């Protein structure tokens, strides 16, 4: 099983992606800001449940920074397709992580009250099949929290490096989620603050045919704190409403029978 899973990963992600992610995930403004938004949304989900200590699964947990945060809200477990990612999680002291693919989760039916898939389903050839697998492991009325990249015209080098299959609009995300057997309770765009800069940079790079190995380097130390605070501040808006556009799209949905 391990070998089959590992060979499904693009070579770039096998050799370079996870070591870089492990180094930057705790401090890079984008990950810090996103994690604060996710934290606020998970707290919102937990408030709707009868159990104050829910069982939570992070699908595609990567090197584990989000999983550590999720442990503040319940019994958090993780699964990732990469043996390298699982090892990095263990280096963080996380021992509730399994090796497995999103399309074949190594868990029993009706196991979790909350499942997160944070920038995961865009990697899948069949995103609806992956969402149905998430539905399988969710308990009745359990919630899934999805975070995905938005708008195909924002396609950039990080999409190529990360082996993305697509970026979403809110209608396309909602359609996939509902087709998989969920009722969407809330959805919005996110990261509106950096929408225009990202659009400009990626458009110029395409126009000039510039290439970069990764976008992780966009982490100017003097601006890292302000950038992360600006991104994270969106959680106060998202707690009360929606954003009309952004670099990402986010969705909370409930499993229905």
Predicted regions and their residues:
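Conserved N-terminal segment of class I S-adenosyl-L-methionine
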Residues: 1-110, 114-118, 129-131, 216-221, ...
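Short, glycine-/aromatic-enriched active-site segment of Class I SAM-dependent methyltransferases
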Residues: 23, 144-166, 170-178
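Residues lining the SAM
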Residues: 118-121, 147
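Di-metal (Zn2+ and/or Mg2+/Mn2+) metal-binding site signature of metallo-dependent hydrolases
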Residues: 123, 127
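A short glycine-rich, Lys/Arg-flanked "PGG" loop and its adjoining helix->strand segment in the class I
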Residues: 128-143
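Conserved S-adenosyl-L-methionine
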Residues: 182-192
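C-terminal helical/coil "lid" or tail adjacent to the Rossmann-like core of SAM-dependent
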Residues: 194-228
